[in-house]
């Protein structure tokens, strides 16, 4: 044990000498670092080592590196990079490696390892860590999503990201999180291609070019026999023209060419929509009913966010409205939290499309990270929607759907309970916006009160403090508040 401790201590000698030479730490501080590291190394050398020993050591080294970086900046040290400039992060990574070798069953440890490597921009190491983690935990959806997000967002390699998702689905066909991540991956790729095509055709300014920086132009090639078969769509097909045609001026195009291009673009839009539709159909074959509904809620949230893309607009009109109505009739008899969330999305479908997201944004069926996570609601878009004269018609559609749900006795109480909870929170969030006109806000508050009265009548909900506050505020705003009015 002593030899092992001494070996690791000797590895840090060049680093400590460099720190002393640069006057970042004085002699006493160096001695203190040596003593602290020796204590940690002795703990790690024991036969019964604990995970907390590794975590404490890692946190100490991270704090030490943070202090070193601050002093380095304050002293304004210039010159070439020396060993002390990179020894800190390297030591932390090595400690994570030792920890994962010992406690390879801890998924949180692997995720912390990946996140630290991403934080210090060790791109090549992140990929290796993901591979090692997935070898130990092939059935963990979060690790697959993190690995895919790294390939797509950081490495700009959509082919590798797609290969990871297909491999994940082969091993976890019944996991809705991976299906939702796969859908968002394809949708994100299409969104990037759309933004890039807008730049190439001159329809938007170059300010949006950062959206597509580093995006690979690899085509969606044919997949192996054991992967999900999807239609092939390339960048050239998406643009609907060759690169030479893109560079032509508008004056060079005649009317017949324009008509041909429009037809071609419509065909490409249908191809892209078919890719997304196939994912939905395949997921329904592989997932249980409850898992599929959770997946579909996540699909709706993703489509809400990307409604500016023509593919999503086409898919919404041709497929999603019909699927949502069919799901409402087919699943309304099911009891469970996720079915109440689905009713909530169906009820607010028209408004969420315009708001570019479910409202509030934290009300999601399936959570995710990176490109797979939900975006926050944009106050500017909310303001535009609430001041639009058409919002009154959308509100009327919500009222009609709400009434159909309230009066439908086939919907189980448990499902209605979740729906009402989400319903009042959404109305409260929208009515609380500064852009909401007084008449609109009043109508929303009255609708909230009606929902609370329905819940009280059915006795299906025990109100928490947040719902109590919403009910009280709605009564005050509508002029019906009584000081002794409380909810059971």
From Swiss-Prot:
Pfam families (UniProt xref): U3_assoc_6 (PF08640)
GO biological process: maturation of SSU-rRNA from tricistronic rRNA transcript (SSU-rRNA, 5.8S rRNA, LSU-rRNA)
A GO molecular function held by the record: snoRNA binding
Extent of the HAT repeats: 31-63, 87-119, 121-153, 156-188
Membrane spanning stretches: none
Subcellular locations according to the entry: Nucleus, Nucleolus
Coiled-coil features, chain-numbered ranges: none
GO cellular component: cell division site; cytosol; nucleus; Pwp2p-containing subcomplex of 90S preribosome; small-subunit processome; sno(s)RNA-containing ribonucleoprotein complex
UniProt-listed InterPro entries: HAT (IPR003107), TPR-like_helical_dom_sf (IPR011990), Utp6 (IPR013949), UTP6_N (IPR055347)
Record-annotated disulphide pairs: none
Keyword entries, A-Z: Nucleus, Repeat, Ribonucleoprotein, Ribosome biogenesis, rRNA processing
Assembly with partners or alone: Component of the ribosomal small subunit (SSU) processome, composed of the 35S pre-rRNA precursor, the U3 snoRNA, and at least 40 protein subunits. Interacts with U3 snoRNA.
Protein role: Component of the SSU processome, a pre-ribosomal particle required for the maturation of the 18S rRNA from the 35S pre-rRNA precursor.
Family label: Belongs to the UTP6 family.
Listed name of the protein: U3 small nucleolar RNA-associated protein 6
Lineage: Eukaryota, Fungi, Dikarya, Ascomycota, Taphrinomycotina
